[in-house]
Amino acid sequence: MGSKNKIQRFKENKTFINLIQPNREKIIKKQFEFKGNWSLNYFKNNNPIVLELGCGKGEYTLYLSELNPKINYIGIDIKGARIWRGAKTAIEKGIKNVAFVRTQIELISSLFSNGEIDEIWITFPDPQIKYK
C-alpha cells in the first residue's frame, strides 16, 4: 500500500463512528469513556461482548458479527491502515453490533471493566509460533 493511500485511510478513520482511537494518555490516566459502559453507552443493549485481539482487517470480527447479531463484537488492532478495512466494511453493510478500537493490546485492562467481556479471541497471533 502506498503512503498516500495509508494517509488517506488514516484521515478516513477519524470519520468512522464504529472506530474508536483513544488517546493513550487518557487510557493511562483511566479516563476512557466506555470502560464499564460498553453495553449501554456504545452498543445500547445488554448483549454479550466478544473481543478479537489483533483483528487486522477485521474479517473474522465482521463474519462473526453477521453470523451472531445478538452478540456484540469488538476488534482491536494497532494498525490503522488495516483496521480501516473492517470499520469501512461494517459501515457499508450496516452492521451495528461491531466496533473497532485502534490501540495497543497491552492497554485492554484500561478499556474494559472486570466481567465486562464474555470472550476473548486471538485468532491469528503475530508473531506465530515457529517450530525448529
Predicted regions and their residues:
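S-adenosyl-L-methionine
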Residues: 1-49, 59-66, 87-115
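Short beta-strand element of Class I
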Residues: 71-74
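Conserved short alpha-helix immediately C-terminal to the canonical SAM/SAH-binding motif I
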Residues: 82
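Mobile active-site "lid"/loop adjacent to the S-adenosyl-L-methionine
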Residues: 117-132
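Conserved SAM/SAH-binding beta-strand->alpha-helix loop
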Residues: 79
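Class I SAM-dependent methyltransferase "Motif I" SAM/SAH-binding loop
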Residues: 54-56
